């Protein structure tokens, strides 16, 4: 490896070609789809959950790089682009993903813009103390223009946490929710059916969704708190946009067809327009 290479992303500084914007979807499979809608798409590297492409939009170079799921892998992506590759404070990092709404009025297919995140992720504590806010740091005027152009329906606070207990899931096994405190999930572990109950030892998240709803939190996801905390504390600019694939007041797991159509419409088309407004 040359000195300019990074351990996980497999990129060199030269690969960026002066890019000052990095679009960061979670899913590696979305990266090529996003890059293909822009000019001169080039695949740079693919290693584990990190797939990276470079493309041009209105003559300006940008990077599309997946983060994988959750805060720790997301932090690697931010660290290796911003620190090792020397991306400066002009850099915009729009986090693009899918999400579950927790407010009844938010519909599947809606576009949400996060202004701040509830830091339930854990990883963000490695970059700033809990008292430090996880806030959007995009330039206000351009961010406002981007919100209008992508048809954002709701702007507000997001909760970043784990997929199961942090987002208070009970019915993943498919059983009816009769009594939350007694419902368990059955998982196949080492080819044997064993009973597993997320809430049998730590109960702090029982009833938490209703508390977040009362405080006006609009959705759950798993990465924005890490991205926003890291960038805000290091003088970088970042924002979060997400397409709603399920409303948690109605069901816990999204319908497969709904998820596919929402991802296709949102992640591949809307993000390019948002990037154009932010460049």
UniProtKB/Swiss-Prot annotation:
Instruction: State which pathway it belongs to.
Output: Pyrimidine metabolism; UMP biosynthesis via salvage pathway; uracil from uridine (phosphorylase route): step 1/1
Query: Recorded GO terms, molecular function?
Result: uridine phosphorylase activity
Provide GO CC annotations from the record. cytosol
Substrates-to-products reaction catalysed: uridine + phosphate = alpha-D-ribose 1-phosphate + uracil
The UniProt record lists the keyword Cytoplasm:
yes
- Give the EC class as a word: transferase
Question: What would be one Pfam family of this protein?
Answer: PNP_UDP_1
Q: Which Gene3D superfamilies does this chain map to?
A: Nucleoside phosphorylase domain
Q: Subcellular localization, per the record? A: Cytoplasm
Asked if Membrane is a keyword of the record, the answer is no
Q: Which GO terms describe its biological process?
A: nucleoside catabolic process; UMP salvage
Q: What is its EC number?
A: 2.4.2.3
Alphabetical UniProt keywords = Cytoplasm, Glycosyltransferase, Transferase
Q: Which family is annotated?
A: Belongs to the PNP/UDP phosphorylase family.
What biological function has been recorded for the protein in this entry?
A: Catalyzes the reversible phosphorylytic cleavage of uridine to uracil and ribose-1-phosphate.
Q: How does it assemble?
A: Homohexamer.
Listed name of the protein: Uridine phosphorylase
Q: Which organism is it from?
A: Klebsiella pneumoniae
């Amino acid at each position: 490896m040359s000195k300019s290479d990074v351990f996980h992303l497999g990129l060199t500084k030269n690969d960026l070609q002066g890019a000052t914007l990095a679009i960061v979807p979670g899913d590696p499979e979305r990266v090529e789809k996003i890059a293909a809608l822009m000019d001169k798409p080039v695949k740079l590297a693919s290693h584990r959950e990190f797939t990276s492409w470079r493309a041009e939009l209105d003559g300006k170079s940008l990077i599309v790089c997946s983060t994988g799921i959750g805060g720790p892998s997301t932090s690697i992506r931010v660290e290796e682009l911003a620190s090792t590759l020397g991306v400066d404070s002009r850099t915009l990092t729009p986090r693009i993903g899918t999400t579950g709404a927790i407010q009844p009025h938010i519909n599947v297919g809606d576009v949400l813009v996060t202004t701040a995140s509830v830091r339930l992720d854990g990883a963000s504590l490695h970059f700033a103390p809990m008292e430090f806010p996880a806030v959007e740091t995009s330039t206000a005027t351009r961010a406002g223009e981007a919100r209008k152009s992508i048809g954002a329906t709701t702007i507000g606070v997001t909760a970043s946490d784990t997929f199961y207990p942090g987002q208070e899931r009970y019915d993943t096994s498919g059983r009816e929710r009769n009594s939350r405190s007694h419902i368990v999930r059955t998982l196949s572990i080492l080819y044997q059916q064993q009973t597993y109950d997320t809430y049998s030892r730590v109960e702090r998240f029982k009833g938490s969704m209703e508390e977040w709803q009362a405080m006006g939190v609009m959705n759950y996801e798993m990465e924005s708190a890490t991205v926003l905390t890291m960038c805000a504390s290091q003088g970088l600019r970042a924002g979060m946009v997400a397409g709603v694939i399920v409303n948690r007041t109605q069901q816990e797991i999204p319908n497969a067809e709904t998820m596919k159509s929402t991802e296709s419409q949102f992640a591949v088309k809307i993000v390019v327009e948002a990037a154009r407004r932010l460049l």
